[in-house]
Amino acid sequence: MYAVVKSGGKQYRVRQGDELLVERLAGEVGDRVELPVSLRAEEGVLDLEPRTARAEILEHLRGEKLKVYKYKPKKGYRRKKGHRQALTRIRVVEV
């Protein structure tokens, strides 16, 4: 059985026991969170009823650094900026 859950404006296909990285979730390590399920499938039968999946927060971390660089030619205008996305690693406990 698998389900499609929503988190941080994205959708993820998960099974029970899966670990995944999602955008930062509120809560402490060890807390359980509920994620809305948009689709659930079991043995080829689709279930579209609104449900929730439960997941456990394993750790909070930051993604790899992205460098953004912009410039205007012939004018000496240069800007460099970095960004690291805040992420949370979760384990799906129940679908």
Curated annotation (Swiss-Prot):
A GO cellular component entry from the record: ribonucleoprotein complex
Family, per entry: Belongs to the bacterial ribosomal protein bL21 family.
Record PANTHER family: 50S RIBOSOMAL PROTEIN L21, LARGE RIBOSOMAL SUBUNIT PROTEIN BL21M
Complex formation: Part of the 50S ribosomal subunit. Contacts protein L20.
Protein name according to UniProt: Large ribosomal subunit protein bL21
GO MF entry, a single one: rRNA binding
InterPro entries, alphabetized: bL21-like, bL21-like_sf, Ribosomal_bL21, Ribosomal_bL21_CS
Superkingdom classification of source: Bacteria
HAMAP family: Ribosomal_bL21
GO biological process, one term: translation
NCBIfam families reported in the protein's UniProt record: L21
Keywords: Ribonucleoprotein, Ribosomal protein, RNA-binding, rRNA-binding
Entry keyword annotation includes RNA-binding: yes
